[in-house]
Amino acid sequence: MGLAFLAVIYIPPKGDYGDAFRVGIITPQTVFKAQAMHLKKRVLVTGGAGFLGSHLCERLLAQGCDVICLDNYFTGSKQNVMHLLDNPHFELMRHDVTFPLYVEVDEIYNLACPASPIHYQHDPVATTKTSVHGAINMLGLAKRLRAKIMQASTSEVYGDPSVHPQPESYWGNVNPIGFRSCYDEGKRCAETLFFDYRRQHNLRIKVARIFNTYGPRMHPNDGRVVSNFIIQALRGEPLTVYGQGQQTRSFCYVDDLVE
């Protein structure tokens, strides 16, 4: 049995190491090492092998966290995190958030859900379940661990807004039964659950309404405007602009989002 492991076993909560030092079981050096290990933040990122999740995993590792990356690979890819697999502080797990998960973490970032219409309309029932059941399972985990948790929501909670730009106080204009509803309403329901857990269980939550993010590792065929423009430009094709070209859209680079 290694000294570091012995240190973890014998360290009293208030730092009174007494007999353990006197009999030579542990040393001040192993105590310091064990305390440093204990203070290292352990973070769960669901959807961590996706476009956004993989960049978040990189940033958390750079900040000195232990990272558990969770993904079912529906739209995520192991290739997105292949360069992280040799990092001893990174763990990759294949798991679907619609099923309960039992891990020990300090913080949770819930990014699991297909975000492109092509992907989320492929199986709309599964999309809704991912948003709703996934939120319930991750909130339940956060409640049990008293962990901080962040929900990756979306500007799509505003639906087809009649207010531009949209303040956070705007409730939106959403079609509850349309083809996009599996995503829009699923994310709205997830936000409801997050705020109810805060009110009812005093859980530490954050909700981020993400919008039109682009950058390395975005799926080239996700049907969104930036990827469409890039693919058409690389092929030497005219860029497709729908309607009269009067639309406005805000974009966010992935590094800025993670920051």
Predicted regions mapped to residue ranges:
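N-terminal amphipathic/hydrophobic targeting modules at extreme N-termini
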Residues: 1, 16, 23-24
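Internal intein/HINT superfamily modules and their associated LAGLIDADG
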Residues: 1-3, 238
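Short hydrophobic alpha-helical segments enriched in small aliphatic residues
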Residues: 11, 18-20
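Serine/threonine-rich, low-complexity intrinsically disordered segments
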Residues: 11-13, 27-32
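Juxtamembrane/membrane-water interface recognition
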Residues: 20-21, 96
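N-terminal Rossmann-like NAD(P)+-binding domain of SDR-like oxidoreductases, especially those catalyzing
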Residues: 29-213, 233, 243, 254-255
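Glycine/proline-rich active-site loop of Rossmann-fold NAD(P)-dependent oxidoreductases
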Residues: 188, 213-228, 235-238, 242-249, ...
